[in-house]
């Protein structure tokens, strides 16, 4: 797949050190760590700090870049209908938009951030130079700034550059929006540009297209388009760098556009065939194992020597083929020998742990220095408490544990939990009103926790101490590389969550149920017929039977004679002695209450028409 090409490209022409005006300039990113800018032989970066040229303190626009900019503008004016001149510097600003009066120049720059206004000898001027080098790379237009190109590639580069200038290149025009016009909509933010406001117009985008000055940015990098130079492509404006990448791939090593018929593609990025090499030692990685770090490939030897972590358990390097556990800058081998309690040596893989003073412990007792005790029936286990947090996407959240000795420790867990599972049962039944637990209404009663002896320390942490807002996280990393291909990250299995405990079966109700004729009730109320089924695992009581359709808690959906699933007792004057065969438990064919025919026939009409309401 990765055929090793000629090394001629990497040994191509590089400008002599005496010709580079930026040699020795300090790096704005690395500060004192970089001794000064020294151009790499074929990469467009510094040999010392590996940062690009624009990250160093370039005090003035390079002469070659100014010449290229002038050529770009002249070509654009030749191919466009605009006769606007280029921007020129003033005593106060390093660059100003062309064709504006002094008060309009001030109005334009007042719309930009203060640190991006190009005052002379200011951070804004340095920002402009940096954006010129980054947005308009010279090697995208001129073959002389490329490391080494074949004759056919030079022809393609010239044709590529001319086509971009002819079809896409443009320069924004700044002017005051006419007051007589109601206004327009900014192409970037969608807000209105009123009459009298200053706006940027782009002729390539059409006559009505305009932007706020602070909104005239590149679509890809969202940076201000330097000197209002843009490239219009498929309805969007780009800087020169990202517009070229829309048309051709760019080599991640030499930063040049790839015109060769073959290239190397790995992890969504592109390289010249002979540029896919180690970033440190430049050894070819064609068909070899490699590790991608910050979009730069490294061979295994260089990565382990420069970027591998040390295990806090055994002190050895964590190899590329070994998994590791990481927490707040600490790293361990993902093994029981290294990732274990610092006091008792208990393995902590898949278990909660307490980090304290750079060490990890299995319990608060071990972290305080007391003798560890095995979890028993009388002692709460850490894995059963709320300390356990789900491990999602190879990451487990940490929770804070408040100790009894006024010292705050943190508890975390590496236990795995399912991605989806049943939620903990609520203390109130679904469909029942939210009130205190009342067994006579069919609600679950919450068992009181057993009292703890005063002498025994409370090892169970507070529930409020384990919030999900905790920032520390523990992560598990699988081996980075695999033989014969790019690295593949393996996701950890979903975390395991405790199953909710099923409620204990209720004792059978001692209330007598009256037998009734359900056939007569179904004839009177044909719309209220429901099918009931009994839960075989919860006893034979009528409270354990549930209807297949979901019932509502409102009174309108309750059946006659029932309230919250319970039978309404009859008034004393309606109760009559019943035969012995009628004292059996009523059947589940009808959910509503109905009286026997003989009792209904003997009662007055007023009593039969009344409904019992329980307040």
Curated annotation (Swiss-Prot):
Taxonomy, superkingdom: Eukaryota
**CDD domains xref list:** LIM1_Prickle, LIM2_Prickle, LIM3_Prickle, PET_Prickle
Q: What is its main location?
A: cytoplasm
Q: Which GO terms describe its biological process?
A: cell projection organization
Asked if the record carries the keyword Lyase, the reply is no
The chain positions of domain LIM zinc-binding read: 184-249, 250-309, 310-373
Point to the regions of Basic residues compositional bias.
1-12, 508-531
Q: Which disease is it linked to?
A: Leber hereditary optic neuropathy, modifier: A form of Leber hereditary optic neuropathy, a mitochondrial disease resulting in bilateral painless loss of central vision due to selective degeneration of the retinal ganglion cells and their axons. The disorder shows incomplete penetrance and male predominance. Leber hereditary optic neuropathy is maternally inherited in most case and results from primary mitochondrial DNA mutations affecting the respiratory chain complexes. Mutations in modifier genes can influence disease expression.
Q: Of which family is this protein a member?
A: Belongs to the prickle / espinas / testin family.
Function comment: Involved in the planar cell polarity (PCP) pathway that is essential for the polarization of epithelial cells during morphogenetic processes, including gastrulation and neurulation. PCP is maintained by two molecular modules, the global and the core modules, PRICKLE3 being part of the core module. Distinct complexes of the core module segregate to opposite sides of the cell, where they interact with the opposite complex in the neighboring cell at or near the adherents junctions. Involved in the organization of the basal body. Involved in cilia growth and positioning.
Please state what the protein is called.
Prickle planar cell polarity protein 3
């Amino acid at each position: 797949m990765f055929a090793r090409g000629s090394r001629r490209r990497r040994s191509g022409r590089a400008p002599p050190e005496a010709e580079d005006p930026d040699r020795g300039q300090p790096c704005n990113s690395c500060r004192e760590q970089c001794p000064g800018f020294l151009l790499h032989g074929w990469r467009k970066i510094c040999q010392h700090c590996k940062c690009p040229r624009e990250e160093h303190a370039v005090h003035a626009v390079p002469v070659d870049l100014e010449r290229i900019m002038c050529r770009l503008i002249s070509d654009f004016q030749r191919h466009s209908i605009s006769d606007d001149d280029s921007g020129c510097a003033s005593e106060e600003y390093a660059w100003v938009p062309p064709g504006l009066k002094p008060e309009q120049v001030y109005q334009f720059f007042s719309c930009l951030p203060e640190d991006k206004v190009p005052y002379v000898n200011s951070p804004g001027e340095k920002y402009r130079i940096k954006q010129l080098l980054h947005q308009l790379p010279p090697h995208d237009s001129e073959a002389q700034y490329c490391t080494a190109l074949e004759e056919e590639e030079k022809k393609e580069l010239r044709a590529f550059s001319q086509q971009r200038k002819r079809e896409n290149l443009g320069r924004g025009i700044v002017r005051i929006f006419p007051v007589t016009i109601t206004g327009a909509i900014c192409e970037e933010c969608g807000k209105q540009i009123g009459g009298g406001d200053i706006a940027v117009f782009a002729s390539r985008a059409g006559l009505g297209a305009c932007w706020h000055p602070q909104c005239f940015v590149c679509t890809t990098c969202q940076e201000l388009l330097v000197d209002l130079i843009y490239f219009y492509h498929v309805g969007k404006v780009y800087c020169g760098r990202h517009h070229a990448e829309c048309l051709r791939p760019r080599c991640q090593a030499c930063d040049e556009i790839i015109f060769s018929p073959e290239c190397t593609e790995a992890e969504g990025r592109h390289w010249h065939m002979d540029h896919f090499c180690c970033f440190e030692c430049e050894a070819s990685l064609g068909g070899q194992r490699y590790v991608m770090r910050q979009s730069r490939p490294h061979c295994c030897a260089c990565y382990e020597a420069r970027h591998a972590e040390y295990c806090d358990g055994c002190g050895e390097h964590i190899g590329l083929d070994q998994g590791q556990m990481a927490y707040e800058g600490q790293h361990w081998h993902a093994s029981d020998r290294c990732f274990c309690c610092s006091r008792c040596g208990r393995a902590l893989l898949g278990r909660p742990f307490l980090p304290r003073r750079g060490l990890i412990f299995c319990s608060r007792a071990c972290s305080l220095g007391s003798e560890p005790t095995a979890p028993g029936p009388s002692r709460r286990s850490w894995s059963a408490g709320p300390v356990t947090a789900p491990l999602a996407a190879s990451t487990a959240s940490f929770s804070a544990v408040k100790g009894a000795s006024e010292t705050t420790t943190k508890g975390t867990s590496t236990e795995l939990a399912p991605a989806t599972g049943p939620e903990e049962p609520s203390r109130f039944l679904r469909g029942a009103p939210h009130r205190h637990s009342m067994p006579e209404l069919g609600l679950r009663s919450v068992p009181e926790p057993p009292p703890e002896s005063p002498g025994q320390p409370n090892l169970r942490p507070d529930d409020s101490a384990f919030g999900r807002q905790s920032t520390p996280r523990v992560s598990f990393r699988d081996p980075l590389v695999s033989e014969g291909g790019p690295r593949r990250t393996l996701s950890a299995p979903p975390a395991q969550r405790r199953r909710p405990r099923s409620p204990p079966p209720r004792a059978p109700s001692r209330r007598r149920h009256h037998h009734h004729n359900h056939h007569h009730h179904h004839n009177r109320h044909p719309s209220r017929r429901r099918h009931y089924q009994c839960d075989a695992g919860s006893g034979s009581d009528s409270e354990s039977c549930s209807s297949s359709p979901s019932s509502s808690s409102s009174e309108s959906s309750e059946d006659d004679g029932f309230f919250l699933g319970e039978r309404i007792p009859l008034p004393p004057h309606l109760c009559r002695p019943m035969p012995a065969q009628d004292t059996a438990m009523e059947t589940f064919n009808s959910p509503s209450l109905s009286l026997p025919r003989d009792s209904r026939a003997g009662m007055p009409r007023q009593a039969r028409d009344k409904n019992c309401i329980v307040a």
